[in-house]
């Protein structure tokens, strides 16, 4: 896997608790992890003198690839026609280090009732596969401008549903920011994930846009 958010968060958290384990590599309160996708900046987060989490900066610029038909998404999550919104963006392959198909659903009920159809995922992987990755899907619903509710399914990678997917949340935050016409702005999103499987997580994503280009993408997870 070229990049994954939470392993970076966890490794950054643990190493920040024991900086003596990495002499010479811990300076100015930042670490740099070298990974297949590129260099990942990891910034420890503190409450007083206690490490409570990590911020990580996505290794790649946000990119969008091909679109995927609504019907394929509907089959994968066993929902009805009309459940997928395309007014902002059609279902699209996007990423900041690891690619996912990202699709917006009409309401919270559709999000909550989505069920992973592994056969449909296998069919989608045959028809709409991208790169060397299996077909993985993030669906989301906009609660409001800042609170986003999401679910991630990756059954072909052995994960029927993931409780927290930093790489997908980073891509989602960048996708949402790219839909805004402001040339210069900073966007902050709170992405709620894992609630339907009893493992709720909150991933904070911030994106800086300058001259209509996404310049910086950071996501933060508190361990405690």
Where are the regions a protein language model picked out?
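Active-site proximal loop and beta-alpha junction motif in alpha/beta enzyme cores
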Residues: 1-4, 9-224
């Amino acid at each position: 896997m070229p990049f994954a958010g939470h392993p970076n968060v966890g490794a950054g958290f643990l190493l920040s608790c024991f900086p003596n384990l990495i002499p010479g590599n811990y300076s100015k309160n930042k670490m740099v992890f070298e990974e297949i996708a590129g260099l990942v900046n990891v910034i420890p987060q503190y409450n007083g003198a206690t490490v409570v989490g990590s911020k990580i900066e996505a290794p790649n610029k946000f990119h969008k690839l091909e679109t995927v038909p609504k019907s394929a998404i509907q089959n994968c999550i066993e929902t009805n026609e009309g459940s997928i919104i395309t007014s902002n963006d059609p279902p699209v392959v996007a990423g900041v280090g690891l690619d996912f198909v990202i699709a917006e659903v009409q309401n919270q009920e559709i999000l909550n009732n989505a069920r992973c159809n592994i056969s449909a995922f296998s069919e989608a992987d045959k028809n709409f596969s991208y790169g060397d990755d299996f077909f993985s899907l993030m669906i989301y619903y906009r609660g409001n401008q800042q609170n986003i509710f999401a679910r991630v399914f990756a059954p072909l990678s052995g994960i029927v549903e993931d409780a927290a997917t930093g790489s997908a949340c980073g891509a989602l935050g960048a996708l949402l920011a790219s839909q805004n016409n402001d040339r210069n702005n900073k966007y902050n999103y709170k992405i709620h994930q894992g609630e339907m499987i009893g493992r709720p997580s909150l991933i904070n994503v911030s994106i800086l846009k300058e001259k209509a280009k996404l310049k910086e993408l950071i996501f933060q997870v508190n361990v405690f």
